[in-house]
């Protein structure tokens, strides 16, 4: 996704978003210190910038007021507003993000129908030396989740962070982060608890570390994570380590994933700074 501009007045931001929707361009608003306007389809960036310049010159033009009225009264060109949650899901998620989400859901359904152990026998980290050449096992543990809260929590973060990485940096970058963090976080976790674990959280922590540090060191990348959220991630690791909530957490995977993400972001930002 590409951030187009920011407005201090959220109503002005909404007026521009409404008008562009009538032109067939879908923009989204994210509220931070100001109302940030984001574009999912970057091929339309130049067109949006031209329209933005016109809008800034005369935001009170009747066509903008008409577009705002239309967004509240009709469906023409603005049906996305009836289902903003679904529209946001589509706009923020690329193919890799969706494939992983669907795989997690399908595996969760299978575990609910035929039992956790049956699925784990096929997807868990190698639990016997004879299985060490079944290469998929070093990665497929990320698809297994053991409760509804477990999968919802992980998929929400995966969509939010993985989608941003894929939209801004490409599917290849998301694949690399996912594969490397799945392998290394899984390796560390099996040293902590043995092979019977699962979940996307090691990868999620890698994405947290990557997005946060990449945003801090390379703001032009267009990805960022609020510092409050990275603090939350660290507190969650501490809570899991000391078992404050009485829940079984993959602490080794969380710590390893976070370190992997930070390291990858550091390397990538070094390369970016060398190019500039």
Swiss-Prot record:
SUPFAM superfamilies: Rhomboid-like
Gene Ontology MF: a single term: serine-type endopeptidase activity
Transmembrane regions: 94-114, 142-162, 169-189, 192-212, 229-249, 250-270
EC number: 3.4.21.105
Subcellular location: Cell inner membrane
Membrane topology of the entry: Multi-pass membrane protein
Active site: 201, 254
Domain of life: Bacteria
Keyword Transmembrane helix: yes
Chief location bin: membrane
InterPro entries: GlpG_N_sf (IPR038236), Peptidase_S54_GlpG_N (IPR022732), Peptidase_S54_rhomboid_dom (IPR022764), Rhomboid-like_sf (IPR035952), Rhomboid_protease_GlpG (IPR023662)
Gene Ontology biological-process annotations: proteolysis
Leading EC class: hydrolase
PANTHER family tied to this protein: RHOMBOID PROTEASE GLPG, RHOMBOID-RELATED PROTEIN
Family: Belongs to the peptidase S54 family.
Protein name in UniProt: Rhomboid protease GlpG
Gene source species: Salmonella choleraesuis (strain SC-B67)
Gene that this sequence comes from: glpG
């Amino acid at each position: 996704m590409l951030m187009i501009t920011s407005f201090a007045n959220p109503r002005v931001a909404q007026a521009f978003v409404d008008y562009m929707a009538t032109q067939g361009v879908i923009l989204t608003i994210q509220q931070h210190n100001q109302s940030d306007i984001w574009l999912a389809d970057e091929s339309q960036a130049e067109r949006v910038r031209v329209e933005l310049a016109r809008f800034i010159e005369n935001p009170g033009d009747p066509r903008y007021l008409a577009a705002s009225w239309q967004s509240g009264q009709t469906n023409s060109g603005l049906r996305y507003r009836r289902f903003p949650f679904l529209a946001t899901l589509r706009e923020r998620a690329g193919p890799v993000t969706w494939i992983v989400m669907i795989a997690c859901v399908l595996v969760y359904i299978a575990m609910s129908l035929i039992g956790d152990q049956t699925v784990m026998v096929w997807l868990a980290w190698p639990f016997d030396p004879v299985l060490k050449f079944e290469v998929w096992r070093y990665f497929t543990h990320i698809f297994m989740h053991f409760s509804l809260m477990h999968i919802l929590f992980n998929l929400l973060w995966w969509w939010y962070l993985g989608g941003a990485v894929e939209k801004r940096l490409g599917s290849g970058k998301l694949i690399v982060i996912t594969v490397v963090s799945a392998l290394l976080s899984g390796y560390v976790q099996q040293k902590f608890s043995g092979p019977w674990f699962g979940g996307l959280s090691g990868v999620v922590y890698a994405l947290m570390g990557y997005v946060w540090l990449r945003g801090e060191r390379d703001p032009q990348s267009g990805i960022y994570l609020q510092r409050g959220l990275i603090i939350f991630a660290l507190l969650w690791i501490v809570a899991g380590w000391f078992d404050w909530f009485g829940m079984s957490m993959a602490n080794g995977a969380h710590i390893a994933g976070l370190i992997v993400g930070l390291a990858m972001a550091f390397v990538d930002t070094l390369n970016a700074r060398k190019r500039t």
